[in-house]
Structure formats: structure tokens, C-alpha cells
Amino acid sequence: MEFNLKGKYGEAKVFADIIDDRTTGQIIGILNTPLGENSHVRIMPDCHAGKGCVVGTTMHVSNKVCPNIVGVDIGCGMLVVELGKIDLDLKIFDEIVHKIPSGHESYEEPSHDEYSGKRVSTSELQWYGSGLIHCNENHPGNWFKKLKCFNELDQVPRLIGNLGSLGGGNHFIEVDVDDDGNKYLVIHSGSRNLGKQVAEHYQKIAKKQYVSKRRNEVIRMAKAEGKEKDLQEILKTFKLPVWDETLFYLEDEDMQNYLHDLKLCQEFALWNRRMMALTIIERYFIETIGAHEDVVGRYKDDKIVFVSKTINVGKTAKSVWTYNFFETIHNYINFDDMILRKGSVSAKEGERLIIPMNMRDGSLICIGKGNEDWNISAPHGAGRILSRGEAKNTVSLEEYKEAMKGIYTTTVSQSTIDESPMAYKPMDSIVENIKDTVSIEKIIKPIYNFKASTEEPIWLKEKE
């Protein structure tokens, strides 16, 4: 199903069956600002109301941009590592995953001392090759200084410690399996607190920029009407107009500074996910097949190559492992075609992508069709049908546990109930609405799931 919505400055096409009044209002809100002018706004099937704008928005960016539309979790997305027909000890795997900082944790915290050394050696891999980090020659803080807004950042050491950490909310680490028995490591995370600080900083600038322009406009009009003597009184009573201040936008130099920092945040988010994948897989080899601490993974094109110079005698003779991987980003601006995607993903012709449904039903692995009418985009998930508050108030823990039967997880609890399968739209409603933009290659089902919980993690309990 698709329909159009119109506003003062533009029109949007909505590809959705299920949409509520608040979501509709937020779409029209964008169209009632200059942001909607000639922006080719397309709304994805998983759309729902978000903080300040609709999750599921795609639009073209030219001479203005609103940081709130991209959002605070800049560069958030999914990393998929194809593990093949590997046998996994999920108990050991879970213990390793619990040592990845999640929620508000970071590697700067003393409780992660036993992993911090491993983290540093791991981060040397290709961080310097990407220009992001070289642990020996350049302190990580030097990379952060590339940000135009560096001097406005708070707690930079903690931001550095967030590299390779999961975060909370709907972020997860999962192992899925397809019908042929192939397993997939799936990691969903973003730019952590860095993206939040950058987004909020530039949204404040957008407001200041808008207020300044409006004030200058009032002054100009007063002078043109011969009311200069009344100018001070006029300025006291002038009001900010018309639309929600969450949609104030940047132009000119401020916009270019934002785009510069946005690109860096997107890079940070990408390597944050890659860091976690390397740490998990390296540690799993060390714990299960006798690989010594020298095992190191490196990213090369669309592959991860792990090498160990020494293997414990009698365990295995293999010392090189190669896995394919791909990534799907959903809160970002694509600088190749200047398409902004907020809760939506790229679906270029032939492009492989993942669309997660929920922690019970797994994900769709799809191939993009390059549909221009869809802004070459697809939904980033099933989309919420219950807000976090509604889920906590209406879904019982027993119902949640029942839904997750058969999936290895130690994080099903009251604190993650807002991410339960019942909080999301049914898979069928998404599958039926994406045929024009992607073809479904396969459905992968979870056998393991981890979400950040406010409860004390297992690895910390063991230290007591």
C-alpha cells in the first residue's frame, strides 16, 4: 500500500499499511518546512513516530539539513559476519559477549581491566589503515580532534573507551542460522555517545541560526516600514514561528561543518561494530580451539581474516580463518548520492542488506533492486507497534519468556521487555510492502541473542 501526504513546501510518498496519527503528523511537519522542498521524501513501511521526526524517513539533501532528522545515533547500523557451518558453544559465546561493554559501560571502566589489553592489541589491526586510530603513534584523542566541534565534546576519554562497545536500547549481538545450517554473527550498534553529543551540538546551532535569521528579518521589515523607533518593542514581542523547533535546520558553513563531523561519526560507528566482531571471534578461538593470544583479525575488502601463529597441540592444525561480512547502515547521510536515511537502509541494485524483524523471528537478508521511487531505500526493521512505555506496561515477563523459548539468551528480563517481539510490527506487514525495493534472499532465525540489561552482568557477578 502507498499513499501521498502534502505539506506547505512539499509532498511525501508513504509505503506503509500501518501508520498512526502521530507518525502522519510528523511527516507533514517536515513537509511544512523548507526541508520538504524538492527533497523527494519517501517514508518506509516500518515508519513510526520518533523524537522530533519519523523513523523510516528518506529524503534528498541539497542546501539545508536538520541534525534531528538524522538523529543522535549517527551511523547506527548492522554488521553481519557469515560464520558458515561452525559449531558454537553458546555458553562460552555468551560469557564472551557479556564482557563487551553494554548499556552505559565503556572500556574506560576499571572492571574491564582483563580485556583492556586485548582491546588495545585488537584495535591496532586496521584502525590506522582506515585513518581512524594508530594506538602507538597517535593517541586516539588525536582522531577526535578532527571533529569541528571537538572543543564542545564532553568526557572525551570516555568516548574513546566506547570504541568496541554495544550500547543499550534496541542494540544487540545475535547469532542466527539459515535453512542450510549456516550461522551469522549480527551486531547492531552505532556511534554511542559521540553521535549524541555531535547531533545535539549542531541542533543547538541550527536553532541559533534560525533565531538570528528571523531576528534580522524582523529588523529589515521594521526599517522598510519606517518603524525603526519602535524596533526594540517589536523585537521584544517577535516570536519564533510556525514549525516545531526540532526541525530547525543548518545551512551554509554550519551545514558543511555538520556534514564533516557526521562523516566522522559514521566512520566511528562502523569501526565500533567491527571492533566488537573481532574481539568476540578472536576471544572465542582462544577459549575453544586453543589459539594463543597472538590470534589477530584484519578486515580486507569484504572479508575478515583471522591468523594465529601458534595453536595448542592436539586441538587443531588450522591457523587461518576467513569470513565474509557485509554492513547495512540506517541513520546516516550517504555522501555518494546525498540521500538522508533515518531508520531506513540503502537498497542499490544488487546490494546485499539485512532487515531485522525482532529478537524471536530473526532477520531478512535481501538484495536491493535500486528503485528510484523508493529513494533506493528499504526499511531498517519491522518498526515498533508499541512504544517503550506501552511495551513495559502491557507485555508480561511470562509472555516475553514464552516468546523466546528455544533461543539461548541470558538477557530476557523486565529491563529488556520494551524490546520483546510483541513490541514490533508483524513480519508479514513488512514482507508484503518491500517487494518493489528488495528481493528476499533468505530468512535467518536467532539461536542466540544478547541485549543490554540494567541488571548486573554475569561477568561482573563472577568477580565478587
Predicted feature residues:
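Long, basic N-terminal domains or extensions that often function
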Residues: 78-79, 85, 112, 126
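Domain-length cofactor-binding catalytic modules of enzymes
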Residues: 2-29, 36-43, 49-57, 64-67, ...
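Long, low-complexity, Ser/Thr/Gly/Pro-rich intrinsically disordered segments that act as flexible linkers
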Residues: 102-109, 113
